[in-house]
Amino acid sequence: MSSVTGSGITSGFIDLATYDNLERAMYGGSDATTYFVKEHYPVGWFTKLPSLAAKMSGNPAFGQQFSVGVPRSGDYILNAWLVLKTPEVELLAANQLGDNGTIRWTKNPMHNIVESVTLSFNDISAQSFNTAYLDAWSEYTMPEAKRTGYYNMIGNTSDLINPAPATGQDGARVLPAKNLVLPLPFFFSRDSGLALPVVSLPYNEIRITVKLRAIHDLLILQHNTTGAISPIVASDLAGGLPDTVEANVYMTVALITGDERQAMSSTVRDMVVEQVQAAPVHMVNPRNATTFHTDMRFSHAVKALMFMVQNVTHPSVGSNYTCVTPVVGVGNTVLEPALAVDPVKSASLVYENTTRLPDMGVEYYSLVEPWYYATSIPVSTGHHLYSYALSLQDPHPSGSTNYGRLTNASLNVTLSAEATTAAAGGGGNNSGYTTAQKYALIVLAINHNIIRIMNGSMGFPIL
């Protein structure tokens, strides 16, 4: 291996001598430094620690909702997460499917246990999201290095979502009680510059409200040879249907110096935040028509649209955006049948009778858009994205369209031939469509909004 001698290094100055107008536009002037000098950004002293959200009201039980107050023990809230302990579930030998019965939690347990979450200031909703958003957001923003850990957090693990045979059968087991964790994707959780300044909001009661689904919409009782699913009842389980659960909301609070605390409490501040909007759910039947449109009566500056056609044949089978219902596979695993493909064939976007996006194949929305503008391409089938922003996950504006100024915006979705086949039903055992499959079109929008903090309270200056 050769090396550059001292005289050879001198020739490197030729490169520096080529500096001209192009370089003036690309690089800094005489007061700039190279990448080899670390620039230091002095910040105020602070520390952070976890805190339990207290002042709980309501009942943390399946099918109920509860709310907690944001702790005042800190000056800023950096993030929040829900910890919930699932109950132990044992399928009795005398269940309604008998020896062929199996029991499991639905896919993405914590996404489905939580029906909705709302952040409110004095009963004014600042941000709200539901199961569909949790499914979609995690698909587009989850780095691969964190995916396995995230699945462990939300319960997407074999001990909970793989079928467990009834007592007395081969492979019989109990679905264990388990502590699950759901990071709550609020606007203040992704960028420290958007931390929630509770120190500046002494006159606001800040609460997080969590609505939980009923237990019979979460546990799947399925026949292990036909794939038939039956709504679960109390007599199927040892001890009956679980009711109350252990649930707590935790937050990371930051503590700052007295000088910064005093300055922040008297400063008027505008924060650019994100919110989630949902169009009314539209039931679609490809046997009646293959193309459907839904009006998108959204408001504010929309940065991204996310849409899915959800298979809603069985209420207990959540997070299913394919044409058919999963069945019990070999070794008591979950098997996706051959027709477990995307129900969407193509989609177009129309503004006021003008085509904004032509009819694009599903691969554009599920592969191309996420490749360029999101952190991840979805690993699950059936998720579709159109991002006005150059970076979906960046909370800072990088592109949007003000839907409040559009009088007629609609999304036109064409369903696939496989969806038409499955909607007719009549498939064989374990085909996933022995019964007619039902679908719902779900459209979500992520929008920017302005929160103004002034005189100890928050508000929305632009409604």
UniProtKB/Swiss-Prot annotation:
InterPro entries: Capsid_N, MCP_C, MCP_C_sf, VP_dsDNA_II
A cellular component annotation (GO) from this entry: viral capsid
Highest taxon of source: Viruses
Annotated coiled-coil segments of the chain: none
Subcellular location field: Virion
Keywords from the UniProt entry: Capsid protein, Late protein, Virion
Gene Ontology molecular function, alphabetical: structural molecule activity
Primary location: virion
Classification via Pfam families: Capsid_N, Capsid_NCLDV
Subunit structure: Homomultimer.
Job description of the protein: Major capsid protein that self assembles to form a T=133 or T=147 icosahedral capsid.
Record-stated family: Belongs to the NCLDV major capsid protein family.
UniProt protein name: Major capsid protein
Biological source species: Frog virus 3 (isolate Goorha)
Taxonomic path: Viruses, Varidnaviria, Bamfordvirae, Nucleocytoviricota, Megaviricetes
